[in-house]
Amino acid sequence: TKKVMDWAGFDSLEKMRKASTEMLYTAGNFYATVTGDRTGVVTGRPIVDGYVSLQSFDNAAYADALPNIPYMIGYTQDDMGDMAPGIAEFCLNRESVGGKAYAYEFARPLPTDHRPNVLEGAFHSSDLWYVFKSLKHCWRPWTQGDWDLSEVMLTAWTNFAKYGDPNGPDGGEWAPYTKDNASFMLFKLDENDQENSETGDPIPSQNRRFPF
């Protein structure tokens, strides 16, 4: 916040408080684009206001006030910070109250042609292309391996929505994260499958819809 405040020319906290939400988000994102410093990006977080939000998520979890349902929780390899410890703690919390939580890490760096101002790596939200099997709506040079990975993830998420278990009714290898099974399901391409892991042909430009 201090970086954006100084960079945007706010010389007092009072002036910054008077700025519109749109201006603060624009300033933060512009700062990150120009400087390459992603810590300047303004992100929104829930605030306990006693009206819409009565308590923090952490407090609700520790008080066993969360719905008694299975959970799926994960992060991407190049996400916004190290998410693994918090995810592990949440899963153990669910175990302590008799619940289940399935943890995952998405570790497929998205294929790219290295154009300017395009995110690279397994960045935050990059897993959604695979979960919803919407690869065809993106310009990136997907390989057959990407399509195969997307099918695996789509099936797991669909099973979880339908059965509360990403493995489906017949079971599988994705076990809940517990004290005795402290492991994340890892989603990535098979490095041994060179044909499907290498960068494939780009999708025609007329089919490119999103910059990320």
Language model: regions and residue ranges:
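Substrate-access "cap/lid" subdomains that shape
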Residues: T1-N93
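Mobile gating loops/cap/lid regions near enzyme active sites that modulate substrate access
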Residues: N29, A88, L92-F212
